[in-house]
């Protein structure tokens, strides 16, 4: 065995061995318990970043541990390969998205291999290949036939100059990111999948997900947003149609003083015909961004339409306003306003001088003070005619019943969740498999014409999708009739909603899934990824699973038993101010820092001598130039060190602070393990361990070994606190390094201990452990070695620690046999020099002994 630890030599050798032996390739095996460990698949952006490395290291540790427990472990990987960034990069690099994407996949695959992740590469998928998306297209046509897919117009961000649709992130300050033209909201026909048909089940089944973080479940509950309320119909003077609104607070109905409609509502459009101010307002609303998050914070504005609605219970006339906070896509595009008891309505009414009528008493029974803000709490009604004196529930029911009786209201369950719009007016995505005949009939693409293949050899002009720009591409025939293909492509969340299931049978040609394989592996046992996916991806992922279940492909209700959301990776961030006052961010690698005695950064400069401003730790990002390239770190320290640091520096679900000093520490620890194994094996063969012949000290050391095995097993398996597992192994290593190596049983004990340490470290640092296991004479490859099992007998304490007090003050601690008598304990206490000096020349008047815990000597 080499004396020096050289990761650059051993890691490539071990990786080659895994490749040749196909160590991590698995097939279904009914005789073994399965374990499906999955990390969210990466987007092939070009290079791995530390966030990827953290996610995949956690997954690999879990997979390798479960494999050592004897389970049949599936850990696949693939590429979420469609999407907008490829289009931008293709234009910038004067290429097409396909070659750019495939080059990135090849590069990143190599990076994943150098990190030693134990993937079953035979199952690798790239979502941009027709072999993959053909099944998604077929499934979509089946959903269409089931009535779960429909087309309707929906608002998008439209750049009038480029004549193209923009994603929300391509709208900068209301303008197109490319040409700076003012962006408009435009209604265009788009395809939707009816996720709302599954809203109740998606909500209800969250209760089955015991091993998902509560934060994620709460976010999904809020996003689905189930509410119970009443739908109320208003007559409008001089308008042909009625207005319908939905409210969850019918108890406040007698305080409704105006209605608000969306700028796009037919009533507003009609009123604008002879109202220039309203027409201008509608125009302004058309140019606001679609993003819902921005709706909440923007200034609330409106214009009176001049129409008056009739309050169905009081008969009063109340004004109808057009307002920018009402969206056509949500509900009916009209809301009732109760400014006394809703803060948004209150601010709007205050701004435009509209009536504010209180109808709920304050908690103390007095009339509410509405001079500053609305009273939003529930309470007892007043100012409400026959409903005065009723509390929330009674008022809700009485008013709902009264409205129903008059034929102007009905109870409704509503959802905040909207159907999933899957159309994207982009090129680099899977074509939507629908066609339109010359007479306007819309049909799904016939199965014998699937897949609809996206042409990859295209020229990107940066504006129009090549398949929209080429009229020939859309032409096809269906049943002998000319037809035009849909030129929109799928939202890329489509591909990532079912990839986990395709991994179970990636070569299957008869359909989307091989049910036998899918039901052997599914559900996923642990799914690892960032919390930023809580609502979009993780909701679509659950939805698709239910769709596949209802199509008879899978039997489980949910796709993943456990969800682990790893924390972000942070790094130091520095900048200097340039000549024009701009911030120039400098990589932490290039910052020369001075620290105080506590290790805090107090001064920094770069190689060019710029004084740097230190802004603390923040998420690694391109914008702050504080990403650390994993490849550089692997070249400097080896993959095992990077992996060990990632798992040791912080609990998996908390943020991780990248500190190179910590990486160096992880590297030193691996070298210490290497050194101890080297010194141990250099002394030649080892005798068999005879546990009955061990001395007390040897038994105590063996107890530490087996207690560590028990703790590490619990930390990795049940608690998933990987950092504390590593800390326990480090603590044991310190004891082993100090243990005497005189007799043959000393060496036999160290042999047992090191074989356990190397197996416990294997999930974290598999290359070095592969090598050390061979050096220690372990049987076969460590990849097939069983996880060490703690010996219950070895862990039994035969000694105990007794606290010794003199006159009630602690004067020392002594180790005694578990079954020691009071006399033996007293005698041992007298030999303890820290205690003895307090007993010198005094008489012990009384002895208080709590067996195995405390000895108190009362002296005088």
Curated annotation (Swiss-Prot):
CDD domains: Anticodon_Ia_Leu_BEm, LeuRS_core. A motif ('KMSKS' region) lies at residues 619-623. Its EC number is 6.1.1.4. It catalyses: tRNA(Leu) + L-leucine + ATP = L-leucyl-tRNA(Leu) + AMP + diphosphate. A motif ('HIGH' region) lies at residues 42-52. It comes from the Bacteria. One of its GO terms (biological process) is leucyl-tRNA aminoacylation. InterPro entries: aa-tRNA-synth_I_CS, aa-tRNA-synth_Ia, Leu-tRNA-ligase, Leu_tRNA-synth_edit, M/V/L/I-tRNA-synth_anticd-bd, Methionyl/Leucyl_tRNA_Synth, Rossmann-like_a/b/a_fold, tRNAsynth_Ia_anticodon-bd. ATP binds at residue 622. Keywords: Aminoacyl-tRNA synthetase, ATP-binding, Cytoplasm, Ligase, Nucleotide-binding, Protein biosynthesis. GO terms for molecular function: aminoacyl-tRNA deacylase activity; ATP binding; leucine-tRNA ligase activity. It holds the Pfam family tRNA-synt_1. The keyword Aminoacyl-tRNA synthetase applies. GO terms for cellular component: cytosol. It is found in: Cytoplasm. It is an enzyme of class 6 (ligase). Coiled coil: none annotated. HAMAP family: Leu_tRNA_synth_B. NCBIfam families: leuS_bact. Belongs to the class-I aminoacyl-tRNA synthetase family. This is Leucine--tRNA ligase. It comes from Salmonella typhi.
